Design a protein with these regions (language model features):
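N-terminal low-complexity, acidic/polar interaction/targeting segments
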Residues: 1-234
Length: 234
């Protein structure tokens, strides 16, 4: 699904292309572009195409577990893709056993010495959000978020926490508006590809919170419908 600025996500990779990318980033002390796949675009030589907007991310806490690389991605600045640079090799199916990075590089290095196993891109880095969210609007949003979580918890029959408890938990971290808090809310609430891309491409903080408000309202309606169906079955 991708990442938002100022948020973190633990990741596991095992494909040679991602291992090469991480090696390059660590050696050069540079970020990588964390971008969701665009479901509407055609494949690029068999590779899933990237979406328009992504987040420059730093890899931290790298460790090996068997054939897997484990690390934490830290989201930083947003970017817009201008041009995709294709991978040196088309996508291939290797089954359960992947070749090494070195073996794959040997197959293209003579013809394409600057090539990489992973997709790259020319990008435009986007500035931080402009504008500020009124305190009353932010308070209303946190209230709505808490209500949404309580409804979801009730449907899942999970913790059984009430609105007052959930609201208190959210208020500990989100009592005052901050861009960091806004992006954290996006990472938690936005699940649809389109709304996540719209948020990443926004210029103003009020655009982002409008996307969040609409998403929560839509989810509340859906969950109310599911709850009514469950009640009718009982």
């Amino acid at each position: 699904m991708g990442l938002f600025p100022k948020t973190v996500e633990p990741l596991r990779v095992f494909e040679p292309r991602y291992k090469q990318m991480l090696d390059d980033c660590v050696l050069n002390d540079s970020p990588f572009g964390y971008v969701a796949t665009d479901p509407e675009e055609e494949d690029l030589d068999g590779w899933s195409p990237p979406s328009k907007f992504g987040v420059l991310s730093l890899a931290d806490d790298l460790s090996e577990q068997g054939a897997n690389l484990m690390f934490t991605a830290h989201g930083d600045a947003r970017f817009r893709i201008i041009r995709v640079i294709p991978a040196a090799l088309p996508a291939q199916s290797f089954g359960d056993i992947f070749p090494t990075v070195d073996d794959l590089v040997e197959s293209y290095i003579d013809a394409n010495p600057d090539g990489k196993l992973y997709l790259r891109a020319e990008v435009e880095q986007l500035p931080p959000l402009v504008g500020n969210i009124d305190n009353s609007r932010w308070v209303d949003f946190i209230q709505s978020w808490a209500e949404f979580l309580v409804i979801m918890d009730s449907l899942l029959r999970a913790s059984g926490l009430g609105l007052k408890q959930v609201l208190s938990i959210l208020q500990e971290d989100f009592s005052i508006y901050s861009e960091s808090g806004l992006w954290t809310a996006c990472q938690s609430i936005l699940t649809e590809h389109g709304e996540r891309q719209d948020a990443l491409g926004s210029q103003d903080a009020n655009q982002v919170i409008s996307i969040l408000e609409e998403s929560i309202n839509t989810k509340k309606i859906q969950m109310d419908f599911f709850q009514s169906m469950l009640d009718n079955e009982e």
